[in-house]
Amino acid sequence: KNGTVKWFNAEKGFGFITSED
């Protein structure tokens, strides 16, 4: 899957990814 990370919180270790299928 290809996607772009819009936001990533390294402190918590997660982020929001917008994937274009």
Curated annotation (Swiss-Prot):
InterPro entries to which the protein is assigned, alphabetical: CSP_DNA-bd, NA-bd_OB-fold
Compartments, record wording: Cytoplasm
GO CC annotation, single: cytoplasm
Ranges for domain CSD: 1-21
PROSITE patterns found in the cross-reference section: CSD_2
GO function term, MF aspect, one: DNA binding
Sections of the chain in a coiled coil: none
Induction: By cold shock.
UniProt keywords, alphabetically: Activator, Cytoplasm, DNA-binding, Stress response, Transcription, Transcription regulation
Name of protein: Cold shock protein CspSt
Source species of the chain: Streptococcus thermophilus
